[in-house]
Amino acid sequence: MSNANLRKWVGFCFVAIYLFLGVPLWYKLTTVYRASLPINYIESLQNNKFQDIHLVIPVYVKSDTYRFPDVHDAIQVQVNHLLNSQEQRVPWSLQVLPYNETIEQMESEGNQFHVVTLKLDEFIGYSSAYDTKETLVYYDDAAVLSNDLPFFVAQTLVEHTFQLEWTHLNKTCEGVSTNNDVAISYDPNIHLSVTLLSGDGNPVAWEIEPTLTDYFSPFRKFLSPLVNFTVDSSIVYHNDLNLHSLNGSCTSVTWFDLSHTIDLSELSSMAYYPEDSALNLAIVFPSASSSPDGLAFINGTRISDEITTLDWNSYLVPQWGVIIINKMPLKPNSVISEDYLEPMMYRFATDIFQLLGLTEGSQDLLSPYITIDSFKRLTILQNLDKATETLWSLVKLTQQFQGMSIPREVSDNVIEALDLRLQIIDLLNDPGKGGDIVWNNALHLSNELVKLCEKAFFNGEMVQQNFFPQEHMIAVYLPLLGPISAVMFFGFYNVMKEKNQKSKKNGTEREVAKEKLELKEAQKLHAIDGEDEL
């Protein structure tokens, strides 16, 4: 094979490899996979987050004395009138139904419903049960004769029993969240860290395990449908949070004064826990060396009329927990008994309601079951709102970065989240449901919905791909493609140049040969020197 043909075959192989192997391989390695997302549907949800929600809460009415066959219909009319008098941010209503044996049987199995019991009495009033979701409405015969009973029951339900919904779901409220400056953001899993701090290094012990078992475990069980607490305890020596510097400064110290003295960041970072949210209980004893006579600003705490004044003060730290400061230092080898810790646990349990957003300020939780039930519904709506915001952020992110990959897993998570959202809405909109089981299930599903949306948004493969834009791809492949392309280009140029030169040479040779042929023919015809002979 000649040198020219060999060069042609080599060039052809280069071109074939470049076109049939290099280009598909380059396209495969540089193409960013972008799974499709329901962008239009997510955008419609963002524009109107509660467009397909109408929260329905069933309420069952029963009477102990008189039988009112149509009282639930009359109450329903008054309830609708009250609810329609206020523009709602999230549509919601009460479905007033008669109490029957089916509901009674379901309640006996542990599935509690909202029940209104009408009781004949000498006065008109209402009261909410402490350990159930029952509302007692007291009426007299005059209220029956004047037909004022339905309105009074409706007013009690809307403005008192469902006061949280009435307040947070109207148009004037900024959002459905019950969080304030004190409460932490809602999380279904919360870690509780209980720490004993001693200003001295003397060994101490405390009966924290039986105290938590006897006094905090029932509280955990009560709140278990709402939050799941994990608890750890520890003892820290030689740390009184610098409280001795406040000794003698004033007779009354508030949390504002403490915030300028103590540093809780070190205490918060001592324990590792997998939960995203945490609450803290710090029980502090001063040092005997720096405060031998105790802390003068501790005036004592009075839990109730039955319990005498205790030698410690409790301070609620916004979005952190509770600090309990004892007046006197511990003696060496002291053992803090369960009886001493019991009032502290009682006070801490009371403050937890405020830290979770169930109460505001020093407000007492008079009907905890009703309040927690309302808090579940508001949390469900809050989770739906949060999930929609997360999905919309995902859509905006993918639209802003066109080079970002959208893995199939992200698309599957989004579709699953939207299906789960519809499942939650079916539970909220069904007037035939509304017991503890339904609200607990809806809350659990809404927590899973938030996790799914966050999983889709923080997908590792999608975020990692964002760090390799098109400019980086060119920078990576150009050192490889550049030399190969240059060799092929100049090789092709040289081949074409040689081909042109050879074509010119062949053309010149053909012209010379043609002239020689014409000359020979002219000689045969004796046409020499340009003269023709006949």
Curated annotation (Swiss-Prot):
Residues 30-472 are lumenal. Pathway: Glycolipid biosynthesis; glycosylphosphatidylinositol-anchor biosynthesis. It comes from the Eukaryota. Pfam families: PIG-S. It is found in: Endoplasmic reticulum membrane. GO terms for cellular component: endoplasmic reticulum; endoplasmic reticulum membrane; GPI-anchor transamidase complex; membrane; nuclear inner membrane. Glycans are attached at N100, N170, N228, N247, N299. It is a multi-pass membrane protein. The chain crosses the membrane at residues 9-29, 473-493. InterPro entries: PtdIno-glycan_biosynth_class_S (IPR019540). Keywords: Endoplasmic reticulum, Glycoprotein, GPI-anchor biosynthesis, Membrane, Transmembrane, Transmembrane helix. GO terms for biological process: attachment of GPI anchor to protein; fungal-type cell wall organization; GPI anchor biosynthetic process. N-glycosylated. Residues 1-8, 494-534 are cytoplasmic. Present with 7520 molecules/cell in log phase SD medium. Component of the GPI transamidase complex. Involved in transfer of GPI to proteins. Belongs to the PIGS family. Forms a complex with CDC91, GPI16, GPI8 and GAA1. This is GPI transamidase component GPI17.
